[in-house]
Amino acid sequence: MSMSDPLSDLLTRIRNGQAAGKAEIIVPASKLKRAVCQVLKEEGYIAGFSDVTEQGKHNIRVELKYHNGAPVIDKIQRVSKPGCRRYRGRDELPKVMGGFGIAIVSTSKGVMSDRRARSVGEGGEVLCVVE
C-alpha cells in the first residue's frame, strides 16, 4: 500500500511516540524526512536521528527528547498538504508563538527553519509548524 503523505506520517509517529513516552521511533527513510529531522535536531526538538537498515529496508531512527519527563514538542502540525500546498514569500513566513516555535520551510536552497529562511532571504513551501 502506498502512503499518500509520508511527511504527515513522520509527524504523527513523533506525536504518538512522545505521547507514549517512547525513547525513539522508527520511520521509513526519505530525503525529505531526513531534512526535516535535521532541522528538528538543529533547533533542539529531537535528541538525534540515524539511518538504520533492517531486513533490507532503509529506515530512520529518531531519538525523541524530553525535559523533566515532558515532551519537548508541545504541538507539531502539518501546514502544506498534498491537496492544498501553502507557499509563502520571505516576508510572509509565519512567526510561530512569537518566535518561540518554528516553521519548517522547503526552499530552493533546501529544507530549513523559518528563521534561517528569513536570514538567507528565501520563501517557500511551509511544511509544518512546531511549538
Swiss-Prot record:
Key words of the record: Ribonucleoprotein, Ribosomal protein, RNA-binding, rRNA-binding
A GO CC annotation given for this chain: ribosome
InterPro entries per UniProt: Ribosomal_uS8, Ribosomal_uS8_CS, Ribosomal_uS8_sf
GO biological process: translation
GO MF entry, a single one: rRNA binding
Signal peptide interval: none
Database matches in SUPFAM superfamilies: Ribosomal protein S8
Cited Pfam families: Ribosomal_S8
Family listed: Belongs to the universal ribosomal protein uS8 family.
Family matches, as PANTHER family: 40S RIBOSOMAL PROTEIN S15A
Task of the protein: One of the primary rRNA binding proteins, it binds directly to 16S rRNA central domain where it helps coordinate assembly of the platform of the 30S subunit.
Quaternary data: Part of the 30S ribosomal subunit. Contacts proteins S5 and S12.
Protein's name according to its UniProt entry: Small ribosomal subunit protein uS8
Organism: Methylococcus capsulatus (strain ATCC 33009 / NCIMB 11132 / Bath)
Biological classification of the source: Bacteria, Pseudomonadati, Pseudomonadota, Gammaproteobacteria, Methylococcales
The encoding gene: rpsH
